[in-house]
């Protein structure tokens, strides 16, 4: 005979948690807005404004993630209750086990939705840019920057995010000097914002014929993409715009025209650049978008006094602001802020970062 009371208690618990989320996530307003967005996307002329249509499509995906999940929770809990009744009436353990398995799946789905409460920042739902910069140390540091790039690309892929290399500077022997990656997806900035900081690698260097232990540093800087309708005033007189020929690995030029664009904001010293398109105009637009995002982040720093110290670290990462240590000799990766540690170093370097990211978000970093 199977024990039904614990299962009924779980159903009651999940129902209550689901009801709390409905209020917290403003289910009714989101459902109403989803209907409005769907109606707008069904209009035949919606694609006359492609950017508007894309924004609506993205909003719909975000709304559906909440509305559909909560709808599925409600229906799923009703279905499980029905299965339990059948199992009891027929004294059928197989049906009972099926109900428990469905309940497990529903609880996992609800836990994922509950985690969204970590994303309370104004721009947590935005796409983002990730800048990786090799520290001093030549080839070893540049190889480490390349390993970080691969790690974050793998992580983004595992979450279903879209990635685009905006700008990449190749290392002289191996690896990269720097890279800017655009990461697009639901709550991309919210997920990655706590990854800003210095990452420290300790290993026996493959570039050292003596196989000696080396310590290398690379920094990561995450900032949100700012919508075009955000009011950031940029005085054209404050900008220096340089064009140059795009180059690939080894320094060879990949085209004969000066299509690559570098923009410098003279008052702040902020630099953005783009060379991933053959069109100079498109590269300039992308570089301006990044500049707008970086200047917006700077404004947010000024306005938010409580988080000033943390934001200063984001905009000017010092090599002392380490967030994570990767000691490959000892098979140990440790987050220096949360204390989370793992010995499965290869899995982390292959993109298994959620345990670190979730811990830092829960800690309110």
Swiss-Prot record:
PTM comment, free text: Methylated by PrmC. Methylation increases the termination efficiency of RF2.
Name the UniProt record assigns to this protein: Peptide chain release factor 2
Source organism per UniProt: Escherichia coli O6:H1 (strain CFT073 / ATCC 700928 / UPEC)
Matching SUPFAM superfamilies: Release factor
Compartments (UniProt record): Cytoplasm
Taxonomic placement: Bacteria, Pseudomonadati, Pseudomonadota, Gammaproteobacteria, Enterobacterales
Secretion signal, residue range per the UniProt entry: none
Similarity comment: family membership: Belongs to the prokaryotic/mitochondrial release factor family.
Keyword Protein biosynthesis attributed: yes
Function noted in UniProt: Peptide chain release factor 2 directs the termination of translation in response to the peptide chain termination codons UGA and UAA.
Keywords recorded for this protein, A-Z: Cytoplasm, Methylation, Protein biosynthesis
């Amino acid at each position: 005979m199977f024990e039904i009371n614990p299962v009924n208690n779980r159903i009651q618990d999940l129902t209550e948690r689901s009801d709390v989320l409905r209020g917290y996530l403003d289910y009714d307003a989101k459902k109403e807005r989803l209907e409005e967005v769907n109606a707008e996307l069904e209009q035949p002329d919606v694609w006359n404004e492609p950017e508007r249509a894309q924004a609506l499509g993205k909003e719909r995906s975000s709304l559906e993630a909440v509305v559909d999940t909560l709808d599925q929770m409600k229906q799923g809990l009703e279905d499980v209750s029905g299965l339990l009744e059948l199992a009891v009436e027929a004294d059928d353990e197989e049906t009972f086990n099926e109900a428990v398995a469905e309940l497990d799946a529903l609880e996992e789905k609800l836990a994922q939705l509950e985690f969204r409460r970590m994303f309370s920042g104004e721009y947590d739902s935005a796409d983002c840019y990730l800048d990786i910069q090799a520290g001093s140390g030549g080839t070893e540091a540049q190889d480490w920057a390349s390993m970080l790039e691969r790690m974050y690309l793998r992580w983004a892929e595992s979450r279903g995010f879209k990635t685009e290399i905006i700008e990449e500077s190749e290392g002289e022997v191996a690896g990269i000097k720097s890279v800017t990656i655009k990461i697009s997806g639901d709550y991309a900035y919210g997920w990655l914002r706590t990854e800003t900081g210095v990452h420290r690698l300790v290993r026996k260097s493959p570039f050292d014929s003596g196989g000696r232990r080396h310590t290398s540093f690379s920094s990561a800087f995450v900032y949100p993409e700012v919508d075009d309708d955000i009011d950031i005033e940029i005085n054209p007189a404050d900008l220096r715009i340089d064009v140059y020929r795009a180059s690939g690995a080894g320094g060879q030029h990949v085209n004969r025209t000066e299509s690559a664009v570098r923009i410098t904001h003279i008052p702040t010293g902020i630099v953005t650049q783009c060379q991933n398109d053959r069109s100079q105009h498109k590269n300039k637009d992308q570089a301006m978008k990044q500049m707008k995002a970086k200047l917006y982040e700077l404004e947010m720093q000024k306005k938010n006094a409580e988080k000033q110290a943390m934001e200063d670290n984001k905009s000017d990462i010092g090599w002392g602001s380490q967030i994570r240590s990767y000691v490959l000799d000892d098979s140990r990766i440790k987050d220096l802020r949360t204390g989370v540690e793992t010995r499965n170093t290869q899995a982390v370097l292959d993109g298994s970062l959620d345990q670190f990211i979730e811990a830092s978000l829960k800690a309110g970093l």
